[in-house]
Amino acid sequence: MPTHGLPALGLSPVTRRLVATGALALGLAVGTLQWEAPASHTPSPTEALAPAECGPGSRPETGTVGRTPADDYASGRAAEGYSCNTRLVSRLGRSGGLKVERYEDARGNVCAYYDVARMFPLGFFDAGVEGVGTAVVDMTRPRKPVRTATLLTPAMLSPHESLILHRKRGLLMAVMGNAGTLPGMFDVYDVSKDCRSPELLSSTPAGILGHESGLSPDGRTFYASSLLADTITAIDLTNPRLPVPITTFAGGWSHGVRTSRDGNLLYVADMGYPTEDNFVSGGLRIYDVSAVNARRPLAQPKLLSTYTWDDVAVPQVPEPMRIKGRDYLLMVDEFSELAFDPTFSYDPANSAGIARIIDVDDPKNPREVSALRLEVHLEENRAGDQQADPGAASPIGGYAAHYCAIPRHRNPKIAACAYIGSGLRIFDIRDPKRPKEIGYHNLPADSGGYAMAKPVFDRDRKQVWYTDFSNGFFAVRLTNDIWPSGL
C-alpha cells in the first residue's frame, strides 16, 4: 500500500510570497479581534424526541434512548452492538477520525477518505496498526473495503476537522490542525482520475493557521478556520496547483464554517470567548462574504448577525440546507458545555451537545425551530447512573454530538449524526420543526462509543459511512424502508 508524502520543496519566490501574505494577513486579523457577546437568542426546545420504531432485524437499545448502560458491558450485550433499521455492510480497521468523504471517479471507482490520527498526535500510539495520516479506501465493492493508500503530506498527516472534498472538481483538501491550532499547511489532491491513488497538486502554507474548514459551492474558495487563534483565512483555489490567500479576518473562536448555495454568506460556528462562568459562550455568526466571493480588492467580510441558544455547549458546525423553499442550518454542538473549571469535570447540569435546526431564511434574524435531543441528553438522566457508563463522563466525548451530514442540500429529507457515545443516529428532517429519529447504529468499544466523524451518504446504495475513534470505519445500510423515496 503506497503512502504519499511531500516531495522536496524549496522556498521558491511563490512560496515566499505566500508566507509574506499570510504573515501580513495574520497580523491584520490579530489587530482586529472582536470581543462581543452574541446579539440575540431564542428559547431552545427542551423535550426529547420520541424513540425510533425499530423494524425486523434490529438490535434495539435496552433502556434510555441513546444509552449503553454499564450493565450491558458487564453482561456482554454491548459487544453485540445496537441497531435500529440499519444493517452493517462492512467495517475496516480499529481507528477512526473526524471526517469521512466519498467520491466516485471517472472510471466508476468509489472511494472513501477519512483521517485515522484521531486527535494528533494521539495516533502515534497506534503506529504500525493505524498510524497517522488520511486513509484512502476502495469502496467499489462495499462488502470488501480495501485500503489502497495513506496520504502523509503535512495537512493530510493531521487534518483534524478540515478534510473536505469538492465532487465536481474532484479535489480533496485539508489544512493542518489539531485540537487547538497548527500552522496552516494546505494540501490539495486530484482524485478525479483514479480516486484510489490521489495525485498531489500542491502543499503550501496558504491556510495560515488550521483546525476546521469550509468550501464555496463552486469549489474555488476554501476557508481555513483556526479556532483558538481567532482567524478565518479565505484561499483562492482557481488554480489548485497554486492556492493563494485572499484575506484573513477575525471570526471569533471559529470552528466549522459553511457557505450559502451562492457562496455569498458564510455561516460560522463560533465557540465564543471565555466568560466568568464558562470556557465557551458562543453560537452562530453569519457573514456577508460577497466581496470575497467576487474577488474584490481588499475584500473583507461583513458581519450580519450573531445568535445563540439557551443550552449552547461547544458550537461545532452549521450545515446549510434548503427545505420547502426556506434556508436552514443543521447546527451541531459538540461535547458538553465546559464550565470555567481547570478540571473540565462532568456536571449533569451542563448542557449536552446536540444537533438543532435553525431557520436562516432571514440571515439577519436566525431562530431555532427544533432540537434533535435524545432521552440520554436530558438533565435528569445525565444526573442519574448513566454517568457511570464507560466514557459517559468524558469532557471530550460521552453522550453528546459532534457532526451531522445530509445527502443533499436541497430537501435532504434525512440526516445522519455522529452522536459520540450514542453512535450513528438517523433523523427524518422533512418537517424541520418536527424532526423524528428513525434509526441508529452503535458498536461501542469497551471504553464506550466514540462516533466522532462527520458521516457521508452513499445514495446509490442507501448507505451511510462513518468512523468510531476506537472501532474504525463502518459502512451501514438503512433498512425497513426508512430511506425516503425520491432521494
Model-identified regions with their sequence ranges:
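Secretory targeting and sorting signals
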Residues: 3-39
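Feature marking well-ordered beta-strand scaffolds used for ligand recognition
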Residues: 22, 28, 41-487
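Short linear, low-complexity motifs centered on an aromatic residue
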Residues: 1-5, 102-104
